[in-house]
């Protein structure tokens, strides 16, 4: 939101032969202060001693002087607009400019700021897809353009920051003649989901040469990923197992391998850095071997519990992760953190992690992490409090000591306007919901849609709160939009849970239409990382919006993503207590399928088909007959990458 006011001209002094970012900083200052009633003149001074991101702010006789490096001058301008004029850059569509405001400098202003992290990348949709907005949040990641001062850490476009083994040694090129290049698992060299044999000297030669080729092809890049692929199956051959045993970690063979690549890179291309993952099976640092100075290990928090801060958590994975964090911090001055900040099973599911974010970012800073990548719902807009989390994470990546209460007050008031107290009440009650610190119900990044920690009674109450919030901003177009999109987390969860659907069918039809309208209005909302899940869900909602309960519940044949090794389907409106026949249309590989229950460990039945039983052509396979129970869901798990499913059918037995 912007407020129209008198256009004013501000005198600006730039360095001789200004950089694009210096010119852009002056343009941004002029554009935003034009919406104010007054602002001092601006002088931009180049000072590369402050690094690319650091800046200094001074009041020089009533003139604002911003000194800094490539990005620092721009960040200094935005800092001044926020602190001294009260302008709030809250989201791509919401900027608050105080009515009749002015930019007033403190008389004794003279301060220098440096960021807590060299690389700051909150991977959320607004920040990832709008470089102007990213720069206003002092984000310095890949999407920044020359006028923003460019990106701080340039990764290769092929050997990026994760999962590059398959690119370095493609199986279709090498496996047939050299299966020994790949992981030995259960006594056999594994195809499909596999890793590399990291003690094989030929693998080292090939990978090193491939890295050389990428450096030659992309000389502007500084960082080149040599990183495990996104599954287990580390090599257990005699040599790899011996190294891992000696190092007391499966990162042992990995770090020795990456060090060997990096040693050759340093000889030929000094200044280039090899990045690798400390992820899942490689998370624990090796006992004996330290990473080289030109290796950047990226420690990933994927297994953690995210409601409670790491330093106060009693969760076993958080305790072990903190130990690993300290171990890697003792090994390197280039520690890179990959943190997780949303629910990847369902971006629109309420995910109350905000009060852990600041403490965790501070913990990373205190343990010498230099780079922070916070993966969020980057695939689509309006995930659970997406705009708030993007803004807060960005603030704390710059300075994790900023207190949370004033930040929350600023954001809620600016983003939700008159509805701020009601939305804040919902936010507080959501985060106050009790959760265990261990076991079923902990807040992990694949939170169940049916988690007992998110009671239906709370969702009903939350829906009423959002109704009230909508009423309060009905005459404010921007805040009305923000509230309507904010309530999607509650609306979609209620619709997907469909409690008492048959008796409340008109209500669910209206809810389906509301959700469909929101998706149509925005166009780039996503449910999760699962391919095909968006269209699957929207198709289901269209049937709900336009059909009777009888029609929807009778025949539930549904197309799904053809390539889906693991799949759970719980989005149906069943007739409770009636019997359905389940079957799946599959080809190519072995699979298991059955029915489980979200609310308990109860298994309603399953069936497994071996690869020998599954034909290469599409065929229907009967799974079981199922008496529908509340909170039950159908699941399908392909045992091999070749296993494909394109239809699941749940047909009521007459």
Each model region followed by its residue ranges:
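Feature activates predominantly on carbohydrate-active enzymes
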Residues: 8-10, 20, 25-28, 32, ...
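Short, well-ordered secondary-structure micro-motifs within conserved domains or adaptor modules
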Residues: 38-59, 65
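Structured mid-domain segments that build the active-site/substrate or prosthetic-cofactor binding neighborhood
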Residues: 202-205, 213, 316-421, 425
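Substrate-binding cleft/loops of secretory-pathway carbohydrate-active enzymes
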Residues: 275-303, 349-353, 381-390
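Extracellular polysaccharide-targeting segments
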Residues: 525-527, 621-629, 635-654
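Beta-strand acidic-aromatic groove motif in beta-rich domains, primarily in extracellular
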Residues: 588-600, 634
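Extracellular carbohydrate recognition and processing domains
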Residues: 600-631, 640
């Amino acid at each position: 939101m912007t407020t129209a006011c008198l256009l004013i001209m501000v005198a600006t002094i730039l360095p001789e032969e200004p950089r694009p970012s210096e010119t852009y900083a002056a343009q941004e200052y002029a554009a935003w202060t034009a919406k104010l009633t007054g602002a001092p003149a601006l002088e931009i001074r180049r000072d590369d001693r402050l690094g690319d991101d650091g800046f200094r702010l001074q009041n020089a006789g009533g003139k604002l002087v911003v000194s800094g490096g490539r990005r620092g001058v721009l960040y200094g301008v935005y800092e001044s607009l926020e602190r001294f004029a009260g302008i709030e850059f809250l989201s791509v569509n919401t900027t608050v400019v105080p009515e009749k405001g002015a930019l007033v400098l403190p008389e004794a202003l003279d301060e220098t700021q440096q960021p807590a992290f060299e690389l700051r990348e909150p991977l959320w949709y607004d920040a990832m897809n709008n470089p102007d907005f990213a720069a206003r949040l002092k984000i310095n990641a890949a999407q920044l353009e020359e006028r923003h001062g460019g990106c701080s850490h340039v990764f290769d476009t092929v050997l990026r920051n994760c999962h590059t083994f398959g690119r370095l040694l493609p199986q279709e090129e090498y496996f047939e003649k050299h299966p020994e290049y790949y992981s030995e698992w259960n006594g056999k060299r594994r195809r499909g989901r596999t890793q590399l044999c990291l003690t094989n000297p030929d693998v080292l030669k090939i990978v090193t040469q491939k890295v050389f080729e990428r450096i030659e092809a992309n000389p502007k890049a500084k960082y080149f990923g040599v990183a495990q692929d996104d599954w287990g199956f580390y090599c257990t051959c005699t040599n790899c197992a011996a190294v891992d045993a000696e190092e007391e970690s499966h990162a042992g063979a990995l770090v020795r391998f990456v060090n060997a690549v990096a040693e050759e890179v340093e000889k030929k291309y000094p200044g280039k850095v090899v990045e690798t993952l400390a992820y899942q099976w490689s998370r624990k640092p090796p006992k004996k071997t330290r990473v080289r100075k030109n290796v950047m290990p990226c420690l990933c928090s994927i297994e953690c519990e995210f409601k409670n801060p790491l330093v106060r958590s009693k969760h076993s994975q958080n305790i072990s992760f903190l130990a690993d964090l300290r171990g890697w911090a003792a090994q390197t001055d280039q520690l890179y953190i990959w943190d997780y900040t949303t629910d990847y099973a369902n971006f629109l599911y309420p995910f109350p992690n905000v009060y852990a974010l600041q403490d965790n970012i501070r913990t990373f800073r205190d343990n010498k992490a230099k780079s922070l990548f916070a993966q969020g719902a980057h695939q689509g807009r309006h995930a659970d409090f997406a705009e708030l989390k993007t803004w807060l994470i960005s603030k704390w990546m710059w300075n994790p000591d900023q207190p949370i209460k004033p930040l929350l007050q600023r954001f809620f008031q600016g983003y939700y306007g008159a509805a701020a107290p009601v939305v804040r009440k919902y936010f507080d009650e959501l985060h106050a919901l009790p959760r265990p610190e261990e076991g079923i119900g902990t807040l992990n990044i694949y939170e169940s849609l049916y988690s007992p920690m998110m009671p239906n009674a709370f969702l009903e109450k939350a829906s009423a709160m959002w109704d009230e919030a909508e009423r309060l901003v009905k005459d404010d177009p921007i805040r009305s939009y923000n509230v309507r999109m904010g309530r999607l987390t509650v609306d979609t969860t209620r619709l997907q849970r469909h409690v008492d659907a048959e008796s409340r069918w008109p209500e669910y039809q209206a809810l389906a239409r509301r959700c469909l309208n929101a998706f149509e209005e925005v166009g780039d909302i996503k449910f999760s990382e699962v391919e095909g899940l968006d269209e699957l869900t929207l198709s289901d909602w269209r049937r709900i919006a336009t059909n009777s309960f009888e029609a929807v519940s009778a025949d539930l044949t549904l197309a799904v993503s053809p390539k889906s090794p693991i799949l759970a389907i719980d989005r149906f409106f069943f007739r409770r207590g009636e019997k359905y026949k389940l079957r799946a249309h599959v080809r190519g590989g072995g699979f298991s399928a059955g029915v489980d229950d979200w609310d308990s460990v109860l298994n309603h039945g399953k069936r497994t088909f071996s690869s020998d039983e599954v034909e290469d052509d599409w065929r229907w396979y009967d799974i079981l007959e199922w008496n529908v129970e509340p909170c039950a869901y159908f699941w399908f798990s392909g045992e091999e990458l070749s296993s494909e499913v394109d239809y699941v059918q749940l047909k009521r037995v007459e």
